[in-house]
């Protein structure tokens, strides 16, 4: 006939598995919470975080973009459109710099390709809009983002410099 497995029967009648589960539940119930209350508390961001795009200026106020169009060429989503014209001194500057944020995949290739760190992806990730048209960034919007986030962008680029 069949022998009775006493250890298995003891586990069954003493509800050992249930008590183990209860013990584990109590352990995590009293452990410190890992959840943050997002709108009121924000977690740390990496210096390499890729958020909302921005165009930067030099400290004297001149735009950094030299209209080389490398960012436009390297963009896999074809989200960047640039028009440029030559200036009196022989250099080029952009007349139009548009980014279609509905196409952008935030890969960071534009930032990597830029020889003068003109286009960067800043620390802002809270840029929800009510209309699709607000996601078409023109040069003025990008420059305004750059002015708004310049201190943090410069600090992040400095922290990331050893890895570039």
Curated annotation (Swiss-Prot):
<feature type="binding site">
    <location>
        <position position="107"/>
    </location>
    <ligand>
        <name>[4Fe-4S] cluster 2</name>
    </ligand>
</feature>
<dbReference type="InterPro" id="IPR017900">
    <property type="entry name" value="4Fe4S_Fe_S_CS"/>
</dbReference>
<dbReference type="GO" id="GO:0005886">
    <property type="term" value="C:plasma membrane"/>
</dbReference>
<keyword id="KW-0677">Repeat</keyword>
<dbReference type="GO" id="GO:0005506">
    <property type="term" value="F:iron ion binding"/>
</dbReference>
<protein>
    <recommendedName>
        <fullName>NADH-quinone oxidoreductase subunit I</fullName>
        <ecNumber>7.1.1.-</ecNumber>
    </recommendedName>
</protein>
<dbReference type="GO" id="GO:0048038">
    <property type="term" value="F:quinone binding"/>
</dbReference>
<feature type="binding site">
    <location>
        <position position="110"/>
    </location>
    <ligand>
        <name>[4Fe-4S] cluster 2</name>
    </ligand>
</feature>
<dbReference type="GO" id="GO:0009060">
    <property type="term" value="P:aerobic respiration"/>
</dbReference>
<dbReference type="InterPro" id="IPR010226">
    <property type="entry name" value="NADH_quinone_OxRdtase_chainI"/>
</dbReference>
<comment type="similarity">
    <text>Belongs to the complex I 23 kDa subunit family.</text>
</comment>
<dbReference type="GO" id="GO:0051539">
    <property type="term" value="F:4 iron, 4 sulfur cluster binding"/>
</dbReference>
<keyword id="KW-0004">4Fe-4S</keyword>
<feature type="binding site">
    <location>
        <position position="114"/>
    </location>
    <ligand>
        <name>[4Fe-4S] cluster 1</name>
    </ligand>
</feature>
<feature type="binding site">
    <location>
        <position position="104"/>
    </location>
    <ligand>
        <name>[4Fe-4S] cluster 2</name>
    </ligand>
</feature>
<feature type="domain" description="4Fe-4S ferredoxin-type 1">
    <location>
        <begin position="55"/>
        <end position="85"/>
    </location>
</feature>
<keyword id="KW-0520">NAD</keyword>
<keyword id="KW-0997">Cell inner membrane</keyword>
<dbReference type="Pfam" id="PF12838">
    <property type="entry name" value="Fer4_7"/>
</dbReference>
<feature type="domain" description="4Fe-4S ferredoxin-type 2">
    <location>
        <begin position="95"/>
        <end position="124"/>
    </location>
</feature>
<feature type="binding site">
    <location>
        <position position="75"/>
    </location>
    <ligand>
        <name>[4Fe-4S] cluster 2</name>
    </ligand>
</feature>
<keyword id="KW-0479">Metal-binding</keyword>
<keyword id="KW-1278">Translocase</keyword>
<keyword id="KW-0411">Iron-sulfur</keyword>
<keyword id="KW-0408">Iron</keyword>
<keyword id="KW-0472">Membrane</keyword>
<dbReference type="InterPro" id="IPR017896">
    <property type="entry name" value="4Fe4S_Fe-S-bd"/>
</dbReference>
<feature type="binding site">
    <location>
        <position position="71"/>
    </location>
    <ligand>
        <name>[4Fe-4S] cluster 1</name>
    </ligand>
</feature>
<keyword id="KW-0874">Quinone</keyword>
<keyword id="KW-0830">Ubiquinone</keyword>
<feature type="binding site">
    <location>
        <position position="68"/>
    </location>
    <ligand>
        <name>[4Fe-4S] cluster 1</name>
    </ligand>
</feature>
<comment type="function">
    <text>NDH-1 shuttles electrons from NADH, via FMN and iron-sulfur (Fe-S) centers, to quinones in the respiratory chain. The immediate electron acceptor for the enzyme in this species is believed to be ubiquinone. Couples the redox reaction to proton translocation (for every two electrons transferred, four hydrogen ions are translocated across the cytoplasmic membrane), and thus conserves the redox energy in a proton gradient.</text>
</comment>
<dbReference type="GO" id="GO:0050136">
    <property type="term" value="F:NADH:ubiquinone reductase (non-electrogenic) activity"/>
</dbReference>
<comment type="subunit">
    <text>NDH-1 is composed of 14 different subunits. Subunits NuoA, H, J, K, L, M, N constitute the membrane sector of the complex.</text>
</comment>
<keyword id="KW-1003">Cell membrane</keyword>
<feature type="binding site">
    <location>
        <position position="65"/>
    </location>
    <ligand>
        <name>[4Fe-4S] cluster 1</name>
    </ligand>
</feature>
